[in-house]
Amino acid sequence: MEIPVLKNILETNDRIAAANARLFDDNGVTVLNFMSSPGAGKTSLVIKTLEAVKAAGISLAVIDGDIASTVDADRVAAFGVPAVQINTGGACHLDANMIKNALPKIDLAAIELLIIENVGNLVCPAEFQLGEHKKVMLLSVTEGDDKPLKYPLMFSEADALVVNKMDLLANTNFNMEGFQEIIGSMNPDVEMFLVSCTSGFGLDAWGEWMVKQVREVGKK
């Protein structure tokens, strides 16, 4: 039996997310929602991504979500990219209204790509639409290969799955073949990237995919 209060919260969120999406489309801005657990390397992937898209001549901004502090936004801003910090004050995810309230701080007409770095959590972020075009799920091999079984919604909702810290794979018990089989049955259409933000392994292919997303939305 569904709890009416939760249903109302999600319906209200979805309406605001739809309005956000229309605003993004009206301005020709591609929006990606980056999600992961804390410590998976999400901010490192954001930085590697902004380096790749900037090299392709794409203008962008970043919204960073955290319970507290401006640490991640400060790291992004150091690369000359506009960054807006959202502190949730305890909430384990961003929601569409938080994004709506942050957008006046960003000149959408001046950018082609907006990256939203969600709060580190494997449960709540997948439940709340923000108005994004694609969801990017990041997992590090040090977290273990059983996460899709424990947190299926996050993995089944993802449009792209980035497996980070591949440089440490040999030092873990992560079963890559078994993991890929689970993902293949759970989300057969997801695009998977094996990377290391430390060594640079796999980042060229990831950067090319990101640029492709911006180009495709720009053609609509």
Annotate the PLM regions.
Residues 3-35, 40, 44, 49-133, ...:
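Nucleotide-state-sensitive switch-loop elements of NTP-binding domains
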Residues 45, 95, 147-150, 175, ...:
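Residues at alpha-helix caps and immediate loop-helix transition turns in enzyme cores, especially N-
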Residues 65, 140-141, 197:
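Cofactor-binding loop segments of dinucleotide-utilizing enzymes, especially the Rossmann-like FAD-
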Residues 85-88, 139, 164:
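Short beta->alpha connector loops at strand-helix junctions that form conserved
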Residues 125-132, 141-189:
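Conserved C-terminal guanine-recognition region of P-loop GTPase G domains, centered on the G4
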Residues 168-220:
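Canonical P-loop GTPase G-domain recognition
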